[in-house]
Design a protein with these regions (language model features):
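ABC ATPase nucleotide-binding domains
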Residues: 206, 211-242
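The feature captures the beta-strand-to-loop junction immediately N-terminal to the Walker
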Residues: 23-25
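H-loop/switch region of ABC-family ATPase nucleotide-binding domains
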Residues: 174-175
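Helix-to-loop junction immediately C-terminal to a conserved catalytic motif
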Residues: 38
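Catalytic Walker B motif of ABC-type/P-loop ATPase nucleotide-binding domains
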Residues: 139-142
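Conserved ABC ATPase signature
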Residues: 114-118, 122
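Conserved ABC ATPase "signature" region
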Residues: 78, 92-110
Length: 242
């Protein structure tokens, strides 16, 4: 971007049966990496290879939707259909597909609700529905659980796990180590380059996490799950300045 190097020496594969989390701090290049995979951004050097005719869905962190525009959830999802630019009307099968994907994501009863009436978690599901309507083989998601509560985060993770079980490859970005990363089967730790790659057991180590986030962390294990805490955090006393 404007001659600023965002990523370098990045090399990894996304396989058809993979569920991958790209982990790193803000500004580490996670979104840029997704855009390279999506091929909406060209690398300054190197190659991004994608299988011909591969169907890729994308759920950005911020959707470009006008919340004051008078449309319902059903209409918003319908607008993402492939033929929306070719003809303004939708076929019966396209409408049925929208109903099916809304039902699958647990928001079938919200179809007639105005989009600005949705909660944060409901908005996330609506945008996921827009991506799924095109029946992607690979789904890319940028921080899909940011700004939602714990219950909604778990619901979204279960939805993505179900999609993966059905054969869809999933790639998501996150900086949430305990809430998201530790539950994923495959992680890529990024801080302008790939710092580590493998299972949570492989990469959620003090050394890799310090290289990724620039902070010392302690890694604990509970019931087979790795948990990350700040190493010797400074206690906060009310009334003092941070």
């Amino acid at each position: 971007y404007d001659h600023n190097l965002v990523l370098e020496d990045v090399s990894f594969h996304v396989h058809e049966d993979q569920f991958t989390g790209i982990v790193g701090p803000s500004g580490a290049g996670k979104t840029t990496l997704l855009r390279l995979l999506l091929q909406t951004l060209e690398p300054a050097a190197g190659t991004v290879w994608r299988a011909p005719d591969l169907r890729v869905g994308y759920v950005p962190q911020l959707e470009s939707v006008s919340w004051n525009f008078p449309i319902t959830v059903f209409e918003c999802v319908l607008m993402s259909r492939k033929s929306s630019r070719l003809r303004p009307w939708a076929s019966a099968s396209e409408k049925a597909s929208v109903s099916a994907v809304l039902d699958r994501l647990g928001i079938g009863d919200l179809g007639e609700r105005h989009i600005r009436e949705l909660s944060g978690g409901q908005q996330k599901r609506m945008f996921l529905a827009r991506a799924l309507l095109r029946q992607p083989q690979v789904l890319l998601l940028d921080e899909p659980t940011s700004g939602v509560d714990i219950s909604t985060r778990h619901d979204i993770l279960h939805l993505l796990a179900d999609l993966h079980e059905d054969g869809m490859a999933i790639v998501l970005t996150t900086h949430d180590l305990n809430g998201i990363a530790t539950h994923l089967p495959h992680l890529v730790c990024v801080n302008r380059q790939i710092v580590g790659e493998g299972t949570p057991h492989d990469v959620m180590t003090p050394t890799v996490l310090e290289r990724t986030f620039g902070a010392r962390m302690e890694v604990l294990e509970h019931l087979g799950v790795r948990l990350v805490v700040d190493e010797a955090p400074t206690p906060y006393t009310p009334g003092t300045r941070i």
